[in-house]
């Protein structure tokens, strides 16, 4: 007897999902070996391959389902039956949350992001793990107090085995205990506590992270140990117990962690305890499930929309030449729409802009480039769009809009975490805030450059300040690889009148960049000029940029830490 079509389609989608996630975990599992062997190029390549997996498998699955269904579009009755059959299979799937997202992606790909109905796909989750699922199988739990902490830490570090030995385990134990005793929560001095660590190690860039929490008298504090490698041995670089720093470690501007998580939802539930203010979608993104993070973001957005009454408005700041940006004032996300025509002198195409955003998605963002999600045919309630915003969108991006009686549908947009534009921040900052922001700004450019990214347009308006005070780049239409740039010094004028000429007295090729010119548009205010020349004067020297290029070409991978240098034990010991 032939299997019903809806059953065959549902089983095929689930099988293809499991094939995708099996390969996802296989790539992830190689992280330990890459860390132990200091295979930093392999780290980058594996990260890119893993990001590309999802779309590849969704595309292949879509083609197969279309073949199974035939040339005619399926009826609404059949679509409901397919979802029903898939829902019947979910109890057997341990990673059902991400499986729902995979089903959604296949459905949307088939229907080109139209016919989005709750009865056809998983706008709301079908299953739940409940409020308090048992996480004990994921954890190692150590009960101790400050007096017995050295013995506990010795056991703890020994439980995480690597082919490389610890450089000096006793030194690391002393550093951890000292830092907790001097700077940790005061309650640790008076009460016994438990350290709960996830058994699986989190890998990113050159680091391996033991991630967990301290539980004491009903209170919870993060407990994160970043491990680094010398090539011959490993060492503990610091201990993180501050919720704010834990949030930065899992920040939206960093590369995705590699952690072996067959059931990522359980990891998210655990991590939520140490980052209670970070939404689930950002945690899913951080552990590499960014496509399910997109599903969670959409659900989060729908929930916020239902609980608020305000209107979407044009985002504060200088209007972009390429993007129109808007937001809901109470929501921590901005929406970015590519304009139909770009404001001169911008000379890029729509496809080039999209390619830049794809580049950022697959590149190591080193904590300095905001992650984005890409949406097609995104719907907004028309009565929630302010008149000014609607007029703006009709003016700059009419081809992207579809209006119905009660909806505004935008054909293509990006979402991004909301930040304060750096230029607006500096307008209101006092002297200390200005200095810290400019220090962050220069560090952001240097770290991006060391990661082979040249921002292109370095105006302050293209950078944002996060709630933690970090400066992050978010305007990608002019980025390029450092290795594509030709950094030059401006040649001396041939004659005195050359300096007054409207045209340069030297030839300029498309990829020529003159760092001396950065000062013209960045250092107009005396206070900004003084601070930048104190902290980052090398940014205006072509030789500095050439040195960075040389490092990149020689395969030098810079160290980038998700915490300040003074937090490192090596710095505290005077190393």
From Swiss-Prot:
One of its GO terms (cellular component) is cytoplasm. Keywords: ATP-binding, Cytoplasm, Glyoxylate bypass, Hydrolase, Kinase, Nucleotide-binding, Protein phosphatase, Serine/threonine-protein kinase, Transferase, Tricarboxylic acid cycle. It catalyses: L-seryl-[isocitrate dehydrogenase] + ATP = O-phospho-L-seryl-[isocitrate dehydrogenase] + ADP + H(+). Disulfide bonds: none annotated. It is found in: Cytoplasm. Its EC number is 2.7.11.5, 3.1.3.-. GO terms for biological process: glucose metabolic process; glyoxylate cycle; tricarboxylic acid cycle. The keyword 4Fe-4S does not apply. The active site is at 371. Pfam families: AceK_kinase, AceK_regulatory. ATP binds at residues 315-321, 336. The keyword Hydrolase applies. One of its GO terms (molecular function) is AMP binding. Belongs to the AceK family. Bifunctional enzyme which can phosphorylate or dephosphorylate isocitrate dehydrogenase (IDH) on a specific serine residue. This is a regulatory mechanism which enables bacteria to bypass the Krebs cycle via the glyoxylate shunt in response to the source of carbon. When bacteria are grown on glucose, IDH is fully active and unphosphorylated, but when grown on acetate or ethanol, the activity of IDH declines drastically concomitant with its phosphorylation. NCBIfam families: PRK02946.1. This is Isocitrate dehydrogenase kinase/phosphatase. It comes from Aeromonas hydrophila subsp. hydrophila (strain ATCC 7966 / DSM 30187 / BCRC 13018 / CCUG 14551 / JCM 1027 / KCTC 2358 / NCIMB 9240 / NCTC 8049). The lineage of its organism: Bacteria, Pseudomonadati, Pseudomonadota, Gammaproteobacteria, Aeromonadales. The gene is aceK.
């Amino acid at each position: 007897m032939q299997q019903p079509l809806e059953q065959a389609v549902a089983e095929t989608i689930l099988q293809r999902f499991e094939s995708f996630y099996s390969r996802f975990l296989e790539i992830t599992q190689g992280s330990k070996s890459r860390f132990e062997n200091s295979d930093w190029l392999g780290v980058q390549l594996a990260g890119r391959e893993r990001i590309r997996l999802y779309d590849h498998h969704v595309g292949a699955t879509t083609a197969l389902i279309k073949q199974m269904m035939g040339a005619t579009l399926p009826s609404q009755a059949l679509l409901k039956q397919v979802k029903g059959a898939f829902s019947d299979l979910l109890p057997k799937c341990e990673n059902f949350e991400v499986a729902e997202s995979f089903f959604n992606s296949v459905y949307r790909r088939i229907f080109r992001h139209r016919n989005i109905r709750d009865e056809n796909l998983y706008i709301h989750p079908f299953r739940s793990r409940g409020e308090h699922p048992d996480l004990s199988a994921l954890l190692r739990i150590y009960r101790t107090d400050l007096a017995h902490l050295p013995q506990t830490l010795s056991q703890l570090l020994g439980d995480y085995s690597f082919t490389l030995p610890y450089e000096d385990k006793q030194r690391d134990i002393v550093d951890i205990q000292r830092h907790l005793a001097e700077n940790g929560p005061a309650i640790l001095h008076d009460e016994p506590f438990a350290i709960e660590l996830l058994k699986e190690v989190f890998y990113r860039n050159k680091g391996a992270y033991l991630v967990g929490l301290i539980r004491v008298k009903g209170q919870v504090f993060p407990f994160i140990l970043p491990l680094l490698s010398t090539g011959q041995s490993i060492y503990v670089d610091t201990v993180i117990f501050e919720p704010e720093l834990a949030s930065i470690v899992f920040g939206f501007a960093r590369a995705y962690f590699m952690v072996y998580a067959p059931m990522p939802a359980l990891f998210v539930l655990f991590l939520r305890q140490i980052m209670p203010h970070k939404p689930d979608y950002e945690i899913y993104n951080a552990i590499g499930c960014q496509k399910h993070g997109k599903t969670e973001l959409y659900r989060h957005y729908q929930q916020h929309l239902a609980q608020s009454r305000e209107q979407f408005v044009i985002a504060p700041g200088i209007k972009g030449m390429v993007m129109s940006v808007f937001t809901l004032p109470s929501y921590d996300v901005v929406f970015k729409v590519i304009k139909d025509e770009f404001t001169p002198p911008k000379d890029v195409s729509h496809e080039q802009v999209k390619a830049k955003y794809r580049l950022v998605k697959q590149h190591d963002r080193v904590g300095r480039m905001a992650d984005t999600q890409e949406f097609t045919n995104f719907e907004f309630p028309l009565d929630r769009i302010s008149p000014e915003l609607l007029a703006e969108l009709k003016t700059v991006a009419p081809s992207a809009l579809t209006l119905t009686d009660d909806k505004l549908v935008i054909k293509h947009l990006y979402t991004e975490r909301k930040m304060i534009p750096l230029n607006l921040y500096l307008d209101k900052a006092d002297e200390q805030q200005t200095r810290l922001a400019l220090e962050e700004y220069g560090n952001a450019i240097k770290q991006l450059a060391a990661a082979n990214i040249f921002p292109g347009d370095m105006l302050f308006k293209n950078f944002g300040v996060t709630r933690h005070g970090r400066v992050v780049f978010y305007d990608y239409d002019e980025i390029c690889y450092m290795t594509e740039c030709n950094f030059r010094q401006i040649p001396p004028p041939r004659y005195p009148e050359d300096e007054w000429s409207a045209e340069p007295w030297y030839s300029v090729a498309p990829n020529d960049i003159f760092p001396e010119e950065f000062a013209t548009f960045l250092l107009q205010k005396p206070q900004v000029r003084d601070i930048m020349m104190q902290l980052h004067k090398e940014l205006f020297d072509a030789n500095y940029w050439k040195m960075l290029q040389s490092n990149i070409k020689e395969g030098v991978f810079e160290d980038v830490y998700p915490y300040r240098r003074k937090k490192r034990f090596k710095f505290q010991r005077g190393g």
